[in-house]
Amino acid sequence: MGKYMKKSKITGDISVMEVSKATAPSPGVRTRAAKTLALKRLNSSAADSALPNDSSCYLQLRSRRLEKPSSLIEPKQPPRVHRSGIKESGSRSRVDSVNSVPVAQSSNEDECFDNFVSVQVSCGENSLGFESRHSTRESTPCNFVEDMEIMVTPGSSTRSMCRATKEYTREQDNVIPTTSEMEEFFAYAEQQQQRLFMEKYNFDIVNDIPLSGRYEWVQVKP
């Protein structure tokens, strides 16, 4: 094993290092732990030799090239503010705020006044409409008008009321019996009363004639 040489290459402008084992054979057998330790030492020595002397902006680690970010950051200079400018701006802002307050209040007052006027106008219109409808209802009752179709009413409510009253009167006309039906009804009752009177007092009230029976009728002359 001492005849072979181990070579380690690193990409870039790095010199190749050749490491050979010691000529004098070490007594005993090299263990695996000792072998790994020797490899670690070899790699660390190669990395130390690979580092450049001057500070460049690139770092070379194994097979990757990393770019070093620039550490020079321009410090932010605080803005220079004069005390007089601060005082003047503060006074101006105060004056502007003081002057702007009554303008906002006046605009709010104008809006409130406009809303109040619009509410009053809308309420007045509603009251006028209600009074006109109320006057039409009171001045034109449907019970005293014979033909409501000839009249022209401003509101639809009066028309609906007139239609309802017409339908109600028609229903009442249909319910009321005719004269012939009333005569038939009372004729039957009169016949019953006449029959009972004739049986009790033996007198015919229709023909004004006395009948034979328990009572004796005498004609009285004036």
UniProtKB/Swiss-Prot annotation:
Q: Which UniProt keywords apply?
A: Cell cycle, Nucleus, Protein kinase inhibitor
Question: Would you tell me the Gene Ontology cellular component terms?
Answer: nucleoplasm
Bias-annotated ranges (Basic and acidic residues): 85-95
Q: Which InterPro entries match?
A: CDI_dom (IPR003175), CDI_dom_sf (IPR044898), KRP (IPR044275)
Give the source's domain of life in one word. Answer: Eukaryota
Q: Where is this region: Disordered?
A: 68-101
Main location, first listed in the record: nucleus
Q: Family per UniProt?
A: Belongs to the CDI family. ICK/KRP subfamily.
- Name of the protein described by the UniProt record: Cyclin-dependent kinase inhibitor 3
